[in-house]
């Protein structure tokens, strides 16, 4: 027969395991998604971390796990780089880092990062554990005195030997913490396993669905073996209920020794079974009041000691062993054996288990009726014996035993000797009690004395009741006693019939049955809304407020009036979700806001964990503007759709607030509507509205680019960039169209340097480069050459803004002395221009230099500086510094490339040799202009300082002179384009080596200079 198994669906108890295992020193932890495409966002934040840092859970969720909002001036940059490297490699990492709380106070933290794997071995989460070690004597943050010296040491300790000394001291302290076993974690490799030798390290749990089951020594209460054992104990209990009254009443009737009794062996065997049952009960699981299956040995033992242990212990006392060892016993010991009848209370406990089967219930009731008749037969026999002993045996012979002996012709001699046998007397007594219980009897065995008549009256009264229960209205009594269970079985039968008629698949059938059973275990089939429907609204609102007090105590409803809360409580319903079930799916219409009362859920998108929700979390979507509510605004078809899946990890109790009911209440209380719409995005743990990733989700990770106001000059300077380094373009060649330019291939000129991705370098929170174009007030001034020639419009040439316009000569802007120059739109290396007028693909780089602001400058009206804005400003400053470093490195590479190009020019000059003109040359070159710079490459108009020799190289057009070039000609005309700079202007790139000249090669000249549009890149 089936047993109530309890809540046995597989659950993902990862969150509870982490909170239990890292309790105390490791209660401050974060969980981050290791499979995210945009960094590693935080998906769970413990309450201890919020208390440690001062940030709320909604402020931390979806931010990067590197915790940039905790950085400050004393945060070590090398330690952060090692942390980022460990994150990219999915490796364990431990470090001591100086973090800053929300109020700006600094604290030293022992950061421990561990990857979490699933059942397939894939890293799906990162676990970050934070330990405040400020009071343990960390450098630079001592509790007393010396803070200024420590800060000075911190400012100087990042360079040279001081930094190495502090690093060594921190490593030694980390080893000390490992040896004391305060911070255990799963080791990797032999050396890590030996670091903690005094205490075993707790293993990191896997993020997976836990298997149901426990130790092999535990006995599951719903297993087959437990059912067989319960059946055996049930038979033993019936045996005790039959034999104990019989032995007590008929023990002193004959002279047979007790040790020769036929039931002695069976009695001892039953006692051993009861003792063994006590031992097994200490190892048997049970179902708690909340429906959970308890498998902890300690909890099982305490529960058994508080319930049935003493009753089972008294019933299992081995009284029959006293007879084996020939210990003299009195009649009181025989009466103590009646205590074993308390085992029948366990039978009443099992009746509820087997009550779902009508046949079993009827059988048990019949057995109880027969057992009652047996007990009354034993009492009827004792009454007859006591009547014989109380009266004169020579004169008194009217008892029912005397009458039975006369009829059986075995009369009593002297009132006590002789008489019918024990067997005959028991059968006659049982016959009398059964006839009295079921009817009025037949008179062959009747009551003659007063005591016998009183007992007969009691027997008839009990018989009338038992007859009505068993034979009169068994079905009515079962329905009255088990009405709720009958309803349960009725609904279960309807559910099974529905599944059978519609032929539902087995997985769907299992889910339906599991949900029905677990829901029934929570609310016992009571529909609160149906039950409270007939109550008045005033009383029903008060009851609803009491039932939904958890969700109504949120800060979101703090500004609501009592009437508003009463109206809201009437639209709140309690729901339940089993493990593995989807509460919402992506793209579904969001019709309610959900508050998690118990259990945990996960938010998924494309099988990636976006957030883990626990008790006290609110999930839903922000409310649209007034007039756009579903069914209330101008658009009645407006529907909010979910952007992710919500799946239950454990058994979850939820309270859902209907969106339509919420809109109705907000319309009735407009004074609270504005406060609710403003506070809902702040209190939502996760926003499920589609499009919140781009518009609303940014509130979780407040990007400095989005939270801080931008300068107006920034937007007006989107087109103020430095021009490319170009060369003048001559007039069109008559009779010929534009030819494609060929890049000058320079293989193996410099060793390859690996370049990191700019996206990974700048962080995912930086806006695109097109939005970071420098303004005129923030960018260095243009060179005089550009100012004088580049900004004048030509009436005959193409307009300056067109792609075909090029300056008349090589223009290189001068470098400022305040820092690395801004990078102008530049042609990507390796992309050839087909000669069209379309703009070539380019990258735009710009930098906004930090403008000094007077310290006395007050913040704008209505704004106050906060630690959060300060941390965001520090983050922006850090990213800008890193961008400047990258730009400087790129400029150095461009400078190196320029020097190599100059070296190649020198080699070409030596290869071509002195100029010469054959007599039959058809190309008459123009004399070079002594006032013009060489068109191929030229230094800047003003030499930059020696410390800044970085130059930008974008495009170098080297057009040849107009005409047809023959072999051995135009050497004299080509020399100006490849000559070194004028002696009067020193080369900022350094002297270029020019080897000795060599005779010209016709093939080289023919392939090198074919048209005036050949270019070098």
From Swiss-Prot:
GO molecular-function term, one example from the UniProt record: voltage-gated potassium channel activity
Annotated tissue distribution: Detected only in brain, in particular in the telencephalon. Detected in putamen and caudate nucleus, and at lower levels in cerebral cortex, occipital and hippocampus.
UniProt-annotated glycosylation sites, renumbered to this chain: 326, 414, 473
Entry's Gene Ontology BP terms: potassium ion transmembrane transport; potassium ion transport; regulation of membrane potential
Extracellular topological intervals: 250-259, 324-332, 383-427, 449-482
Cytoplasmic-side positions: 1-228, 281-302, 354-361, 504-1017
Keywords: Glycoprotein, Ion channel, Ion transport, Membrane, Potassium, Potassium channel, Potassium transport, Transmembrane, Transmembrane helix, Transport, Voltage-gated channel
Protein purpose: Pore-forming (alpha) subunit of a voltage-gated delayed rectifier. Activates at more negative voltages, exhibits fast prepulse-independent activation kinetics and deactivates much more slowly, but shows no inactivation.
Composition-biased stretches (Polar residues): 691-724, 1008-1017
UniProt subcellular location: Membrane
Region described as Disordered: spans on this chain: 138-157, 691-749, 772-803, 821-875, 971-1017
GO CC terms in record: plasma membrane; voltage-gated potassium channel complex
Intramembrane spans: 428-448
Renumbered ranges of motif Selectivity filter: 439-444
Bias (Pro residues) ranges: 978-1002
Assembly: The potassium channel is probably composed of a homo- or heterotetrameric complex of pore-forming alpha subunits that can associate with modulating beta subunits.
Ranges where the record places region cNMP-binding domain: 556-620
Membrane protein topology class: Multi-pass membrane protein
SUPFAM superfamilies, per the entry: cAMP-binding domain-like (SSF51206), PYP-like sensor domain (PAS domain) (SSF55785), Voltage-gated potassium channels (SSF81324)
Family: Belongs to the potassium channel family. H (Eag) (TC 1.A.1.20) subfamily. Kv12.3/KCNH4 sub-subfamily.
PROSITE patterns hit by this protein: CNMP_BINDING_3, PAC, PAS
Matches recorded under CDD domains: CAP_ED, PAS
PAC domain: residues covered: 93-145
Protein name per UniProt: Voltage-gated delayed rectifier potassium channel KCNH4
């Amino acid at each position: 027969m089936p047993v109530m198994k309890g809540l046995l669906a597989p659950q993902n108890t990862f969150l509870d395991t982490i909170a239990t295992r890292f309790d105390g020193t490791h209660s401050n932890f974060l969980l981050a998604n290791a499979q995210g495409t945009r960094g590693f966002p935080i998906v769970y934040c413990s309450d201890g971390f919020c208390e440690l840092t001062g940030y709320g859970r909604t402020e931390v969720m979806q931010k990067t796990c590197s915790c940039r909002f905790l950085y400050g001036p004393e945060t070590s940059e090398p330690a952060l780089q090692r942390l980022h490297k460990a994150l990219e490699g999915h490796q364990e990492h431990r470090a001591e880092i100086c973090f800053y709380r929300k109020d700006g106070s600094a604290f030293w933290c022992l950061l421990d990062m561990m990857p979490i794997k699933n059942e397939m071995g894939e890293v799906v989460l990162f676990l970050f554990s934070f330990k405040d070690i400020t009071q343990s004597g960390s450098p630079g943050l001592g509790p007393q005195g010396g803070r200024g010296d420590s800060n000075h040491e911190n400012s100087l300790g990042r360079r040279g030997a001081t930094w190495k000394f502090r690093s060594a001291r921190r490593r030694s302290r980390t080893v000390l913490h490992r040896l004391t076993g305060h911070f255990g974690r799963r080791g990797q490799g032999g050396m890590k396993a030996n670091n903690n030798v005094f205490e075993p390290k707790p293993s990191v749990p896997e993020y997976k669905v836990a298997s149901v089951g426990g130790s092999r020594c535990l006995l599951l209460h719903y297993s087959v073996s437990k059912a067989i054992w319960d059946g055996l104990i049930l038979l033993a209990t019936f045996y005790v209920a039959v034999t104990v009254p019989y032995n007590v009443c008929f023990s002193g009737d004959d002279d047979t020794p007790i040790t020769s009794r036929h039931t002695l062996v069976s009695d001892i065997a039953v006692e051993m079974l009861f003792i063994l049952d006590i031992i097994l009960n200490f190892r048997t699981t049970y179902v708690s009041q909340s429906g959970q299956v308890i498998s902890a040995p300690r909890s099982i033992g305490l529960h058994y000691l508080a319930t049935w242990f003493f009753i089972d212990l008294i019933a299992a006392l081995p009284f029959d062993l006293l007879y084996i060892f020939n210990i003299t016993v009195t009649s009181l010991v025989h009466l103590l054996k009646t205590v074993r009848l308390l085992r029948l209370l366990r039978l009443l406990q099992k009746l509820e288990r087997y009550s779902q089967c009508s046949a079993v219930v009827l059988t048990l009731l019949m057995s109880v009726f027969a057992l009652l008749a047996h007990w009354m037969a034993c009492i009827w026999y004792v009454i007859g014996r006591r009547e014989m002993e109380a009266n004169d045996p020579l004169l008194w012979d009217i008892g029912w035993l005397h009458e039975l002996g006369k009829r059986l012709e075995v009369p009593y001699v002297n009132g006590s000797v002789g008489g019918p046998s024990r067997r005959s007397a028991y059968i006659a007594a049982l016959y009398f009690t059964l006839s009295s219980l079921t009817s009025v009897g037949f008179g062959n065995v009747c009551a003659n004395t007063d005591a016998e008549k009183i007992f007969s009256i009691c027997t008839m009264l009990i018989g009338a009741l038992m007859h009505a229960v068993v034979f009169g209205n068994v079905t009515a009594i079962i329905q009255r006693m088990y009405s709720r269970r009958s309803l349960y079985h009725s609904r279960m039968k309807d559910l099974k019939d529905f599944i059978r008629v519609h032929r539902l698949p087995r997985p769907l059938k299992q889910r339906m049955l599991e949900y029905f059973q677990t829901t029934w275990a929570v609310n016992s089939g009571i529909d609160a809304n149906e039950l409270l429907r007939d109550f008045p609204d005033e009383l029903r609102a008060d009851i609803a407020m009491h039932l939904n007090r958890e969700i109504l105590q949120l800060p979101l409803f703090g500004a609501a009036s009592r009437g508003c809360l009463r109206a809201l409580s009437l639209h709140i319903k309690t729901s339940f979700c089993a493990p593995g079930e989807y509460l919402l799916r992506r793209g579904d219409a969001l019709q309610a806001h959900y508050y998690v009362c118990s259990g945990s859920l996960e938010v998924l998108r494309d099988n990636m964990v976006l957030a883990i929700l626990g008790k006290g979390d609110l999930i839903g979507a922000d409310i649209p503007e007034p007039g756009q509510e579903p069914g209330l605004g101008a658009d009645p078809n407006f529907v909010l759709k979910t952007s992710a899946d919500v799946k239950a990890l454990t058994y979850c109790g939820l309270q859902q607030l209907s969106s339509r009911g919420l809109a109705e209440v907000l319309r009735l209380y407009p004074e609270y509507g504005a406060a609710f719409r403003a506070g809902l995005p702040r209190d939502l743990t996760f926003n499920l509205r589609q499009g919140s990733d781009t518009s609303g989700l940014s509130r979780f990770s407040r990007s400095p680019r989005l939270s801080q106001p931008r300068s107006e000059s920034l937007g007006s300077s989107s087109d103020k960039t430095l021009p490319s380094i170009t060369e003048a373009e001559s007039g069109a060649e008559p009779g010929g169209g534009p030819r494609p330019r060929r890049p000058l291939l320079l293989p193996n000129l410099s060793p390859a340097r690996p370049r990191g991705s700019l996206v990974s370098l700048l962080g995912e929170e930086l806006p695109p480069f097109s939005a970071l174009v420098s303004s005129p007030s923030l960018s260095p001034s243009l060179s005089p050459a550009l100012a004088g020639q580049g900004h004048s419009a030509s009436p005959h040439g193409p307009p300056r803004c067109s792609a075909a316009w090029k300056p008349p000569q090589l223009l290189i802007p001068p470098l400022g002395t305040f820092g690395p120059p801004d990078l102008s739109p530049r042609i990507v290396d390796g992309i050839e221009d087909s000669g069209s007028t379309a703009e070539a693909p380019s990258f735009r780089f710009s930098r906004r230099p930090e403008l000094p602001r007077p310290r006395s400058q007050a913040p704008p009206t209505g704004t106050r500086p906060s630690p959060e804005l300060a941390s965001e400003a520090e983050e922006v400053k850090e990213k800008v510094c890193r961008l400047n470093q990258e730009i400087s490195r790129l400029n150095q590479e461009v400078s190196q490339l320029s020097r190599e190009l100059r070296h190649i020019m020198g080699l070409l000059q030596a290869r071509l040799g002195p100029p010469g003109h054959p007599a039959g040359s058809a190309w008459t070159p123009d004399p070079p202009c002594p006032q013009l710079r060489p068109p191929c490459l030229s230094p800047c108009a003003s030499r930059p300082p020696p410390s800044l020799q970085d130059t930008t190289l974008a495009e170098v057009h080297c057009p040849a002179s107009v005409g047809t070039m023959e072999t051995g000609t135009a050497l004299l005309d080509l020399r100006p384009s490849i000559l070194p700079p004028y002696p009067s202007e020193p080369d900022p790139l350094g002297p270029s080596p020019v080897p000795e000249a060599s005779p010209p090669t016709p093939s080289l000249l023919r392939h090198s200079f074919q048209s005036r549009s050949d270019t070098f890149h």
